[in-house]
Regions:
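A general structural detector for well-ordered alpha-helical segments in enzyme core domains, enriched
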Residues: 35-39, 67-74, 114, 118-121, ...
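Active-site beta->alpha N-cap acidic-glycine motif
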Residues: 1-84, 129
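Solvent-exposed, acidic/flexible segments
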Residues: 28-33, 60-65, 104-115, 137-141, ...
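Active-site glycine-centered loops adjacent to acidic/histidine catalytic or metal-binding residues
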Residues: 23, 87, 136
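Substrate-binding cleft of extracellular glycoside hydrolase catalytic domains
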Residues: 57-119
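Residue-level "edge-of-site" marker
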Residues: 58, 90, 135-136, 161, ...
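CE4/NodB-like, metal-dependent polysaccharide N-deacetylase domain
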Residues: 43-55, 83, 103-139, 174
Length: 209
């Protein structure tokens, strides 16, 4: 049975802030450079690195090497406090196929390799993969979830996908796409970023019970 939005969608305990997650699915478009610059500007205003979880797909990283390098550089400069989330390697998607049969549920998908190849890519760049895995399309099933548990990873969902007009509340895991494919979500996120009273928290804190 397909499962949608399984896993961690909200902080397990009380959290006085939001958790920003930015998905980088494969895309032919330039990434949201202005948005990442706005995150860096927020960091400068706050006097601390802006916490953000970035979900990296292998194909995006390979096709957008300079953009990927710019994110790593923002981390090195102390502008962004990045939690590197695994978002699969190929992130296959077939237009016209229902979501419940699409993404990692497509035939001939080697799920374990989809996970491990992205981990290897991150490590090769000197990055530390986090314990989090975000399913493409937020679509999984019981078999994939069992494999993920065996690999020791935590499935990451979201309860505030901004492009779907889901409103965050304290403890929300906020989802936007930074790959240029969902500009409306980025537009919505800018409203929350402009609020100087809104706290943004590192994703690991969402696991605290």
């Amino acid at each position: 049975h397909p499962v949608e939005n399984a896993g961690l969608t909200h902080a397990r305990g009380a959290a006085e802030g939001f958790f920003l997650t930015v998905d980088m699915c494969p895309s032919s478009k330039p990434f949201e450079a202005g948005f990442f610059a706005a995150l860096a500007a927020r960091a400068a205003r706050d006097g601390r690195a802006m916490p953000v979880a970035i979900s990296i797909s292998g194909y995006w990283a390979l096709d957008h090497a300079a953009e990927f390098a710019s994110l790593i550089e923002r981390q090195r400069l102390g502008q962004l406090d990045i939690t590197w989330v695994n978002h699969s390697y190929a992130h296959r998607y077939v237009r016209g196929v229902p979501d419940r049969e699409n993404f990692l549920l497509l035939p001939h998908t080697d799920f374990e390799q989809e996970v491990l190849r992205t981990e290897q890519l991150l490590i090769a760049r000197g990055l530390t993969p986090s314990v989090f895995f975000r399913f493409p399309g937020l679509v999984s099933n019981e078999r994939l979830m069992a494999t993920l548990r065996r690999l020791g990873l935590v499935p990451l969902g979201a309860d505030a996908w901004l492009a779907k007009l889901q409103k965050p509340r304290p403890g929300s895991i906020v989802l936007v796409h930074g790959n240029g494919n969902e500009p409306f979500g980025i537009h919505e996120a800018r409203h929350y970023l402009a609020d100087a009273t809104q706290r943004w928290l590192p994703l690991n804190e969402a696991l605290a019970g």
